Amino acid sequence: MAVGITPDTIQEYPYLTVQEYKDAPTSIDYNNLVVGGNQAAQDAELANVILRASSYMNEYLNQSLVADQYTETQRVRVNGQGMIALHPNNSPIISLSSFQYGTDPNNLIALPDCSTAWFEAQQLIIPLSNLGINYSSQGPLGFAGSYGPRQQVFTEYTYVSGFVNTTIATATAGATSLTVTNGTGILAGQPYRIYDGSKSERITVASTYTNGSTTVPLTSALAYSHAAGVAIGNMPNAIKQACILITTAFLKVRGDNSMTMNLTTQPTVNIGNNARYSGEIALALDMVNKYRRIR
């Protein structure tokens, strides 16, 4: 028996690199996370905690803000203006690479030119005139390929959304290009920041950039050389700071909610770290509240 498999895709990425967290003023001893472990083990565990903190943020945000490509299926209805409005699961929407539609989910028709779509922060609008089909405000016409208002349509589409948050593969001072580990979401003409401590710098992608490529031409030469693994992107600093705060809170939490019996005084109860550091998490969530997706 054939098995149906969803085309919907889900990925999970960290909002910070290990070095970005280490460079932040957190007062955390991140070299003693694994008892007896070497530096590689300490860094691996720190990376795991950062990923868990990022996942916690995604749960609150109802989406991931790291630029990635998604394929989704959705049933929609043609509106009164003869348009199809898509509300993807992730935002902000950067690009649309494919769109298929039809009244039969097993026989969808592809949109020939995705550049004709109208982009909004959390929506994509597809006018039926761009699909080469007929539309009547009075309902479906009496021949194939016609649609009317409120008619249900099956759609499948692939898009990119989120903020670029990748790492450098190679970057040499004086060079007019660099390579990254993942080019998803990078756009020609857009500015991005390299997060490299005292050597941090801002770059702008040249108009010759090919969408999705890991080789990124620049409008001006790099001022510094940057090692592999250095973060680059346009992720808002508030989001990165929120991840730093949540990671710090996760690292501080220990099982210390105990009662201490003294000989000459009343027993005292220690305040658990999960309560003590809830303020850090609350501040972090407040910083990213504007990016929550309303479903």
Describe the residue ranges of each PLM region.
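Divalent metal-cofactor coordination and adjacent catalytic microenvironments
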Residues: 1-295
